[in-house]
UniProtKB/Swiss-Prot annotation:
Keywords: Porphyrin biosynthesis, Transferase. Tetrapolymerization of the monopyrrole PBG into the hydroxymethylbilane pre-uroporphyrinogen in several discrete steps. This is Porphobilinogen deaminase. Disulfide bonds: none annotated. The gene is hemC. The keyword Phosphoprotein does not apply. It comes from the Bacteria. Signal peptide: none annotated. It catalyses: 4 porphobilinogen + H2O = hydroxymethylbilane + 4 NH4(+). Coiled coil: none annotated.
Length: 312
């Protein structure tokens, strides 16, 4: 490939790390290729003084990257898959889902206490309604506090704002070399992750055959099947940052197991179940699980969540 390939990414340290990681993998497979990383500030990067639910928009961390790609300013965009809306703009596709890092949430506690050891009424920081809902379902005495910013900012605020603990994604801490901060990996039976959590995705123009062929080389089939099942599940439920939805797909011997949860933001109502099937049927499995949860009452939960969102 003769042309220089422009790789778009958000400007945070974690996003830049992920873009460099992708470029390093591509260079291994295409030593003669030339890459240039382009940092682009997104709406979600610019608004840091409000909870994600208050901003109320999908694509908070991706729209500007996608617009730049459609204008031809960049050739691919590297995303955290959990940030990428389930509906992509016309002309763009997911060219690769890289091998997934551990998708769990983790507790970072100021005094080294695990979730069950936190005092009654403990202050727990997170920007995620999904985490709030599931943790309040598990422990309704916790007091959840909005906590946004990059990893180092959140770890600093944990101390400055006198919080007892914060909940972050394992993958981000691992990639930033901050595993030392982790007090506890929260079990999946307490808190299912966000759709796509732990996965790096590469979005490309659908008509750019050269770049498509290149990025396909770093696609990890099992990760892609799991994430695509999760995204199909989320798409059917029409959930975004504003609705507490979690999911986790796992693939073993080409069998896909998908578990999902829908809850009210206050954690008072929660439905959770799973389905299994052939790995090649990822999208259908996602739809099956969504329908199953809707039958169990997820529709009413989502309706209530959206009504509360509009009132706010």
């Amino acid at each position: 490939m003769k042309r220089e390939i422009a790789v778009g990414t958000r400007v945070s340290k974690l996003a830049m790390w992920q873009a460099r990681w992708v470029v390093d993998r591509l260079k291994e497979l295409c030593p003669g290729c030339s890459f240039r990383i382009v940092g682009i500030r997104t709406l979600g990067d610019r608004i840091l003084d409000a909870a994600l639910v208050k901003i109320g928009d999908k694509g908070l961390f991706t729209k500007e990257l996608e617009a730049a790609m459609l204008r031809g300013e960049i050739d691919m965009a590297v995303h955290s898959m959990k940030d990428l809306p389930t509906e992509l703009p016309e002309g763009l596709v997911i060219g690769a889902v890289c091998k997934r890092e551990h998708p769990a949430d983790v507790l970072v506690s100021r005094r080294g206490k695990k979730l069950d050891e936190l005092p009654g009424g403990a202050l727990v920081g997170t920007s995620s309604l999904r985490r709030c809902a599931q943790l309040l379902w598990y422990r309704d005495d916790l007091r959840m506090v909005n906590l946004r910013g990059n990893i180092n900012t959140r770890l600093r605020k944990l101390e400055e704002e006198n919080l007892d603990a914060a909940v972050l994604a394992y993958a981000g801490l691992f990639r930033m070399g901050r595993q030392d901060a982790i007090t506890q990996v929260i079990p999946f039976d307490i808190c299912l992750p966000a759709v796509g959590q732990g996965s790096i995705g590469v979005e490309v123009r659908s008509d750019d055959g050269e770049v498509l062929e290149l990025v396909k080389k770093i696609d990890h089939r099992e990760s892609r099947l799991a994430v695509f099942a999760e995204r199909a599940f989320l798409r059917r439920l029409e959930g975004g940052c504003q609705v507490p939805v979690g999911a986790l797909g796992t693939v073993e011997n080409d069998r896909l197991r998908l578990e999902g949860v829908v809850a009210t933001p206050d954690g008072k109502q929660l439905v959770r179940s799973f389905v299994e099937g052939n790995g090649g049927d990822a999208a259908a499995i996602g739809l099956r699980l969504a329908e199953k949860l809707l039958e169990l009452g997820a529709g009413e939960i989502l309706k209530r969540a959206r009504q509360e969102e509009r009132r706010e």
